[in-house]
Amino acid sequence: MEHTVKQNKTIACDVLVVGSGAAGMAAALKAASQGLSVIVAEKEQYFGGTTAISAGWAWVPGNRVGTAAGDTREEVETYLKNLAPDTYNADGVAQFLDTVPEALDFFERETDVEFVYPEKAPDYQMDLPGARLGGRAILPKDTDARILGDKRLLMQPYMSSYTVFGYMPQVGPDINEFFHVNQSVKSFVYVAKKLLRTWFDAARYRRPVLRSNGNALMTLMVKSAYDAGVRMWKSSPVLELTRGDDGAVTGAVTGGEHPARVEAKLGVILAAGGFSGNTELRKKYFPHDAAGDDHFTPTVGHGGDAATMTLAAGGRIDDAVSSVGSWAPVTVFRFRDGRQRLFPHLRAIGLPGLIAVDRHGKRFGNEALSYHDFGGRMIAHNAGEDKTFGWVIADEKTMHKYGIGYAKPWPMPRGYFYKMGYLVKGNTLEELADRIGVDAAGLTQTVAEFNVGARAGEDPAFGRGSTEYNHFRGDMEHKPNPNLAPLDKGPYYAAKIQMGDLGTFAGIAVDSDNLVVTEEGTPIPGLLAVGAAARSVFGGGYPGYGSHIGAALVFGYRAGRDVARLASARENGRGIGRPASASVAEEAAR
């Protein structure tokens, strides 16, 4: 079969994995553990993908600790059915839950990955049947980047938006100390120690060596991959899939630092993320971005490469989901030279003394919902408008304690943020409304009504602060409600929020073996898709902390486990365009 991209060098392997995030590395590690030859091709200059800049949680119900604490499969299924009832995928959920214990056992027993099992990490919709306060979401243990030796600088750095002077706080007690750094001597000392260690390491090693959150997970997975003999290629985009005369995918053509024609005997596993960075696909699938200029993604490498390669190979995009993306409202800092820096508001709008309003000065939802659910409210509320946006509003007390996005709390200076238009200030609500183009009467009425309930620890309009998950997104030391405080002390502040994401839930259509399927539903031999590249097993719902990573680890593991079996099971027991090797056949028979 003729291909459009020519490379002189041919390199053979059993499995080619495209992408080095959680899904790709899970597939690579499991495949390598079976004696298979694996290449991981990452188009970015660093390994780790979006997972490496994330909080690193993994939503994996049915894990040993949660099960021992009383969580049941029936409860999980009930919760997921209620989360996205019209798009519930019973078979996919069954595969996910069947595999969770096996996958976690593999990572903890056969790789360097270690997990922490927090007692409390509420599901995102605690008001739904089957939701639980904990036992389903886990996170990786911190690690030292020096375990990678001279390869430690090949890992994706932290996203600056998520760090405080280079340190990335963890959800829970750690981040709460940072919230109270200017209110408590204990918190100040705690934060000072963390920052001094971070700065010392950065000066000595060029980067902080303590890795936490998703960066710790990816550091441990990449270390394990090197130890297992996986060939790790950075800055090596896959330019094109190659196919045999029978239509089976036989490998790919790569460019960048490793230009080659890669012959993958058993298959290609697409784990290159979603398509939120692809303007044309956003215009087609994102409900708020028909013009392609009204969405701001902080993801790494989610340019739709896997989706476009799949479409070229005869596959399709499955958008039969309740939400095509995992929404995450952001504030956008714009530099004079046109560059942008995004701050994803994954927690902060749920803090007491902050509200979000529309162009009419009206609130449009419970700001302490998950970023995904609040983002969905924001998109729906702006339907029919030319742009999707809102404003985060705070008074002086709240700004002093918590700040907004990049504009940090006292004693950090704010002048630069005023100058660049990121933060707007008004001595009164009317003055602030005038400066941001919001209806002044609407804003003053909204704040007055909100304040009445907030003083009593209630939100009659939207029920903010009414669930344990809401409280988890607030300030647990604030009374009477961790999510509510009146806005009653000028001056007042505003920052514009727009729509971002953490990945896509619509994605490549796959069958029960993660094989990519055509419009007719026929599997394409030798081509698998996992992680954010594939349609979400949760049907567009966002069940809890780490929903992307949990599914990525589990289905990446399944793809790596099954790729040899799938190749061996083809007609006449052949691999992709050639007989499977003896070792492959033996492994598939085990």
Curated annotation (Swiss-Prot):
Disulphide-bonded residues: none
Catalytic activity annotation: 4-oxocyclohex-2-ene-1-carboxylate + NAD(+) = 4-oxocyclohexa-2,5-diene-1-carboxylate + NADH + H(+)
EC number: 1.17.3.-
GO biological process: steroid metabolic process
Listed SUPFAM superfamilies: FAD/NAD(P)-binding domain, Succinate dehydrogenase/fumarate reductase flavoprotein, catalytic domain
Superkingdom of this protein's organism: Bacteria
Residues spanning the signal sequence: none
Keywords: FAD, Flavoprotein, Oxidoreductase
Cofactor dependence: FAD
GO molecular function, one term: steroid dehydrogenase activity, acting on the CH-CH group of donors
Alphabetical list of InterPro entries matching this protein: FAD-dep_OxRdtase_2_FAD-bd, FAD-oxidoreductase_2, FAD/NAD-bd_sf, Succ_DH/fumarate_Rdtase_cat_sf
A Pfam family matched in the record: FAD_binding_2
Reported induction: Induced by CHCA, trans-4-hydroxyCHCA and 4-oxoCHCA but not by 4-hydroxybenzoate (4-HBA).
PANTHER family: 3-OXOSTEROID 1-DEHYDROGENASE, FUMARATE REDUCTASE
Family from the record: Belongs to the FAD-dependent oxidoreductase 2 family.
Function noted in UniProt: Desaturase involved in a cyclohexanecarboxylate (CHCA) degradation pathway. Probably catalyzes the conversion of 4-oxocyclohexenecarboxylate to 4-oxocyclohex-2,5-dienecarboxylate, which is spontaneously isomerized to 4-hydroxybenzoate (4-HBA).
Assembly mode: Forms multimers.
Protein name per UniProt: 4-oxocyclohex-2-ene-1-carboxylate 5-dehydrogenase
Species for this entry: Sinomonas cyclohexanicum
Gene: chcC2
